[in-house]
Amino acid sequence: MTIILKPGSVPLETLEKIYREGLPVRIDPAFHAGIEKAAARIAEIAAGDAPVYGINTGFGKLASIRIAAGDVATLQRNLILSHCCGVGEPLSENIVRLIMALKLVSLGRGASGVRLEVITLIEAMLEKGVIPMIPEKGSVGASGDLAPLAHMTAAMIGEGEAFYRGERLSGAKALGKAGLKPVVLAAKEGLALINGTQTSTALALAGLFRAHRAVRTALITGALSTDAAMGSDAPFHEEIHQLRGHKGQIDAGRALRTLLEGSAIRRSHLEGDQRVQDPYCIRCQPQVDGACLDILRQAARTLEIEANAVTDNPLVLSDGRAVSGGNFHAEPVAFAADQIALAVCEIGAISQRRIALLVDPSLSFGLPAFLTRKPGLNSGLMIAEVTSAALMSENKQMAHPASVDSTPTSANQEDHVSMACHGARRLLQMTANLNAIIGIEALTGALGVELRKPLTTSAELAKVIAALRAKVVTLEEDRYMADDLKAAAELVADGTLSGVISAGILPDLEA
């Protein structure tokens, strides 16, 4: 299956499919004429006498240097090779595929001036599985993601490195094995390929998709913890949340209420329970997870716009002029990444407090210490809770905003930058930590519910426990725990736990 992209209107759902499934993509042929028109205009400018930035001049601080017509192709090649300054481990294939798809969307708007053969090469590389090797570090998020995108482009011109069928090869070899030929870049094409926010945006989108799946699963594990602790569902009453009015809170409250419907555990303590109120980590789940959901939705709107944007420079306007601007500055992406980081941090923080509640016999309303029937002889989930605390603390440190930092670069020509790329990249580690925290809560919540037998939980939550137990058997005696934690985190990350819940209960990213 090939996804047909309509530049300017590619929805989040399609972007997530590209990220998760690695499907090949193509630009809708209806956009080809506009692409070729802009390319023809760039060719006209390159053949003329007037200096135009990036077409017949140097770059950055060197923009005042005029380039001879005979050197234009060399200029573009030199630009790519000199900008391949990335360091660190290679970005994963699914991230690079998304970067390439986003670059297609941007170029496909017909304002960048690249020839159609550049577009078709990217499409063919995605179809045949030639994935450029892009180091993870080196971008400050303005002027675009220069170093990462230069590594992408290097493979296109037969330089650099690329992955093909599991092998890490030179760019030329990877293209050759796939039956493809490198492109010779024409005027402005190198600049159009590297000057954009696609790396930052792809990383931020990946973080967004992972965070959304995590918050949906956190609502499930939060409901499990509520039932395990014999908490009240009264704070999830719809009118409470309607009176405040925040959409995320309303949706989170509804999800929690629905997940707990029919629980025999809940019915067992409707009367005679001397506790007046539950701790905040139980009672305030709609307010906290709902606020996180709202901020993820806000970030989603920003990133959907950015994913469809033209972010290189200069741009070919509708009147045929090539005009320099600053769309390459990734400040919107940096802000969105910071928002996502805050949400990820808070989802994990309140989940960790519920884990701590369930393993503490002074708070768990009758559950044994550390959820083991033989405390002392067995330690149960004691250190799993400690691990969740370590991960929570790590995420708090990483949640510091990246966008508030800036440093002058390129001899002060590029004197304010967004730091969007590493602000977005850290989301991968933060969401991995979050998945592990929520996975631990799944273990504590499920075990807590099982320890309430013969009382049973709701039908929806019973499905979640069954999905968990298919991979992680109930903890009866102490055993090697690392495999349990890994399996539980994977069930969060791959959507298994959220996938068993009936449609319409868990909140969507687009509200």
UniProtKB/Swiss-Prot annotation:
A biological process term (GO) from this entry: L-histidine catabolic process to glutamate and formamide
Intrachain S-S bonds: none
Sites of the 5-imidazolinone (Ala-Gly) crosslink: 142-144
Major localization class: cytoplasm
Enzyme class, UniProt record, top EC level: lyase
Associated pathway: Amino-acid degradation; L-histidine degradation into L-glutamate; N-formimidoyl-L-glutamate from L-histidine: step 1/3
Protein name per the record: Histidine ammonia-lyase
One GO MF term: histidine ammonia-lyase activity
GO cellular component: cytoplasm
